[in-house]
Amino acid sequence: MKPHFRNTVERMYRDTFSYNFYNRPILSRRNTVWLCYEVKTKGPSRPPLDAKIFRGQVYSELKYHPEMRFFHWFSKWRKLHRDQEYEVTWYISWSPCTKCTRDMATFLAEDPKVTLTIFVARLYYFWDPDYQEALRSLCQKRDGPRATMKIMNYDEFQHCWSKFVYSQRELFEPWNNLPKYYILLHIMLGEILRHSMDPPTFTFNFNNEPWVRGRHETYLCYEVERMHNDTWVLLNQRRGFLCNQAPHKHGFLEGRHAELCFLDVIPFWKLDLDQDYRVTCFTSWSPCFSCAQEMAKFISKNKHVSLCIFTARIYDDQGRCQEGLRTLAEAGAKISIMTYSEFKHCWDTFVDHQGCPFQPWDGLDEHSQDLSGRLRAILQNQEN
């Protein structure tokens, strides 16, 4: 027997979906929250649960929020199937509010047989410290099952369009800047949840052998400091990592380099123009010519921000890439090669090392010395 569904709809109209799931990070007048859900069961016996939609208002009483409506319904279902394990997936226009987030964490802590994956179109009050802490509490895994939260990318929007929209068999047409907004929100969520890189990803991509092969991605780790009483103070909430977006991934037809993704997110930090900041980047490859030009423009226009770049390897250090690095240095950026100290710092700060110390690879120091000499020659405009 199924419990009765209340306050649900089967599908939404196309304009309703496009309006409410539009993923620009800062939006007004989107006060209705749409929650599309799917419930799957583990094991050979799978009760036929239908995917449906809850909706509610942002500023209404908590019990009318779609997240709470879902759990009210789901709790009734659980009473009929206490021994079953469930995988619940949400696709939601706004991430849950602080109170909903805390109640969700309590529910999941009390029912370890339920796992919840949340795909969000936008982040609600992502700048609020209390909200950030609530999200971390919901998504942390150390003390037992919790939720997994991700930003909706093209694939999730396409899935919702096919599953929850009266699409009349028309294909999903992404709006302008969908992939760019996805990257911005992905980076901001990573900052909030303090995502860490897995050790193999770090050691593979940051290996500093000068002529290494098969490293086609650029990883960029970053941290931000603010000057206070003549001392640089680390801003823990402004720390994270990202990588370039390959062509045809997450809706990027032409791809987007890590440095440009990083520049996209800085305006959302809302750095105080009357304060001095130092941004430090640790990159697996040095910037290409175009990215170096854009980074130079940024620091030229933002005099309150200084930029330090430590790179593991030099990308195509012939021709225009050399010119780009010189332009970036002339604009005021400090460019250096990563040494053991920087590799260890990245390992300790950005990697989920599980308490294991950083183990340098063979040739690390020799490669750093060689690359440092080549970088000096490039910046001094000397022939190799």
UniProtKB/Swiss-Prot annotation:
Q: Name one Pfam family in it.
A: NAD2
Q: Could you tell me which residues carry Phosphothreonine? A: 32, 218
Q: What is the effect of changing residue 67 to A?
A: Loss of cytidine deaminase activity and significant decrease in antiviral activity
Which GO MF terms does the UniProt record name? cytidine deaminase activity; dCTP deaminase activity; identical protein binding; RNA binding; zinc ion binding
Record flagged with keyword Manganese: no
* Keywords assigned by UniProt, alphabetized: Antiviral defense, Cytoplasm, Host-virus interaction, Hydrolase, Immunity, Innate immunity, Isopeptide bond, Metal-binding, Nucleus, Phosphoprotein, Repeat, Ubl conjugation, Zinc
> Which InterPro entries did the record assign?
APOBEC/CMP_deaminase_Zn-bd, APOBEC_Cyt_Deaminase, CMP_dCMP_dom, Cytidine_deaminase-like
Q: Where is this cross-link: (Microbial infection) Glycyl lysine isopeptide (Lys-Gly) (interchain with G-Cter in ubiquitin)?
A: 42, 52, 63, 150, 163, 249, 270, 297, 301, 303, 334
GO terms (BP aspect) = base conversion or substitution editing; cytidine deamination; cytidine to uridine editing; defense response to virus; DNA cytosine deamination; innate immune response; negative regulation of single stranded viral RNA replication via double stranded DNA intermediate; negative regulation of viral genome replication
The annotated consequence of residue 370 to A reads:
Reduced catalytic efficiency of cytidine deaminase activity
What is its subcellular localisation? Cytoplasm; Nucleus; Cytoplasm, P-body
User: Mind telling me what this protein is named?
Assistant: DNA dC->dU-editing enzyme APOBEC-3G
